[in-house]
Amino acid sequence: YERELKYLIKKNEKYTSKQFLEFLYENGYKLVESFEKEKHETYYDDNDFSILKRGDVMRGSNMVTEQFKGFLYKTNKCNPQKPYVSKLELGTKLRGQYKDVNEFIKELNIDVKGQLNIKLFANMKREVSIVEKDGDRLYVSYDKVKYFEKDESNSVYEEMLEIEDWKNPNTTNVDYDYDRHLIKVNNLISNAQLPIELTKDSKYFRGYTVLNNR
């Protein structure tokens, strides 16, 4: 289970990971650690786009930095009253075991129409900072993403921020009621009028929509 705030850097605005961290420091956060990652993601769907329509995500990740490949299915659990995105991750225990996406989806018993095939690629460079304040931790990712359907030379580029509640890192144990921290952070950001805008779109939805509306 994953709960995170997502923001797009507004078009024609320059807003860096460093600037956002400065903003957090001014508001009492301390840096715990920071590192960089690179990953190439592939998004799959059937020809009816059933997964896209549900707001779910079926992705294959090639973690360049960690040299790891695997599939993951994310079910949309968003509450329209809340500013953050909630997703239930399926297949985490099977990651790395399957070479074929259709075998993976069959194992999870997900409702799709026929075979899945590739609908979108996203190559990203991610700057990660883990920050802390009053015992609450945030996993802040600043992503530079290129979306494309076949060839990277015909891609769309975007920058975005993801802020994940990191109270229990790398676990599926979530205190469902404890979302005060993320709500507080979102209020902080809204009041500061930073050049970023809240979004609930997955990267799959975002990339597919942006590429097809050019």
Where in the sequence are the language-model features?
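Phosphate-end processing signature that detects enzymes handling 5′-triphosphorylated RNA
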Residues: Y1-R214
